[in-house]
Amino acid sequence: MWLCPLALTLILMAASGAACEVKDVCVGSPGIPGTPGSHGLPGRDGRDGVKGDPGPPGPMGPPGETPCPPGNNGLPGAPGVPGERGEKGEAGERGPPGLPAHLDEELQATLHDFRHQILQTRGALSLQGSIMTVGEKVFSSNGQSITFDAIQEACARAGGRIAVPRNPEENEAIASFVKKYNTYAYVGLTEGPSPGDFRYSDGTPVNYTNWYRGEPAGRGKEQCVEMYTDGQWNDRNCLYSRLTICEF
């Protein structure tokens, strides 16, 4: 009687076309597709994309209603080209004639007194050894020793120039100051473009010299001239301090 249930089971399995595995897992045939579902809810916003290239400039806007204040003044420009020289002007009117000197007795008296005072002063200074007169020249010294350029400036401020001998008499007069103060002195000569070519301050060649034997020997490195106590000359660097002697 137990065969009946078993036979019934086999008949049912054959009728349904189903195949049962040994592990009790059944695989059916695909069913009929269902109807499409309704639309789902909107998704979340995605992340920001990469920055794009700048767009072209927009059109110019209309001018503003409020005008801007004027800017600051610019820098001065370069000077212009000089203009042509103007024509020479006409000569001015001739002034009134001056008073003849011989008619001005007061002026003549003043000049006479002035000359007398100058002669008295010159005589007093000569006795003190502060000045010496040779011909039309007057030599003077203050006893100070400074550089060549400083001597030139000091003499110019006094209305003279640095002393320079142009003959033996003037050389001896300058040497007397050198002996008195027992120190060397510059004379108004400087070396020209060529070594050993010494000239006066106006650039003219010397017409009188009293060089010590073998001098000048600086070969362009000693451009000034100093005087020894015996009156002889030597070329020397201009930066040394030497006795100030001026001529007027």
Curated annotation (Swiss-Prot):
Primary site of residence: secreted
Regions of compositional bias (Low complexity) in chain numbering: 71-82
Result of changing W233R: In ILD2; impaired secretion
Misc remark: Pulmonary surfactant consists of 90% lipid and 10% protein. There are 4 surfactant-associated proteins: 2 collagenous, carbohydrate-binding glycoproteins (SP-A and SP-D) and 2 small hydrophobic proteins (SP-B and SP-C).
Coiled coil regions in record: none
GO cellular component: clathrin-coated endocytic vesicle; collagen trimer; endoplasmic reticulum membrane; extracellular region; extracellular space; lamellar body; multivesicular body
Signal peptide: 1-20
Quaternary structure annotation from Swiss-Prot or TrEMBL: Oligomeric complex of 6 set of homotrimers.
Keyword annotations of the record: Acetylation, Calcium, Collagen, Disease variant, Disulfide bond, Extracellular matrix, Gaseous exchange, Glycoprotein, Hydroxylation, Lectin, Secreted, Signal, Surface film
Name this polypeptide is given: Pulmonary surfactant-associated protein A2
Superkingdom to which the source organism belongs: Eukaryota
